[in-house]
Regions:
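Surface-exposed acidic, glycine/proline-enriched linker/cap segments
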Residues: 119-141
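Short, amphipathic alpha-helical interaction segments positioned at domain boundaries
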Residues: 114-117
């Protein structure tokens, strides 16, 4: 997951995957809903091995999860990379279009995007008069803006 998802691996409690031979070619992760408590689960990551096409991978992994876990699911599609088509095709409903936001990336180390919540100024430099972006810039990070997200749910 860490090599094949822009945000890297996460700390989800449920990880399911599809294998071809001995290699995982597709993975999906779930956790208890973090931001919207109206939903039981959050589909937090879906990744496919680079240079690999897994036809029906999303639907097979989602079906497996739903056969083994009850409750509603929420997920978010980054509009920079997705129009949400895979969600619509699998029965999800669009519930909200979220405005653009930003993440950080340290180009000297990795291209993984790191959520801004990990770098709040009050955690990094309490009492520092510089704005958050400047604290991060001075530490070698660049601010990357996205196109917003789409929030989807399925009962």
């Amino acid at each position: 997951m860490s090599e094949n998802h822009l945000q890297g691996k996460d700390k989800s409690s449920i990880v399911i995957g599809l294998k071809f031979g001995d290699d995982f070619v597709s993975m999906m992760t779930f956790c208890k809903s973090r931001y919207n408590k109206n939903y039981m689960w959050e589909l937090s990551r879906y990744a496919v091995k680079r240079n690999t096409n897994v036809v029906g991978g999303f639907s097979r992994l989602l079906t497996n999860f739903r056969q083994n876990h009850s409750g509603s699911i929420i997920s978010y599609a980054d509009r920079s990379y997705s129009n949400g088509d895979v969600y619509y095709k699998n029965g999800f409903k669009l519930i909200k279009t979220n405005p653009p936001s930003y993440k950080y990336v340290n180009l000297g180390k990795s291209i993984k995007r790191m959520h801004r919540a990990n770098f709040m100024k009050k955690k990094l430099a309490p009492g520092d008069s510089r704005p958050e972006w400047k604290v991060m810039f001075d530490a070698g990070y660049k601010q990357i803006f996205d196109c917003g997200t789409l929030s989807f749910c399925i009962a």
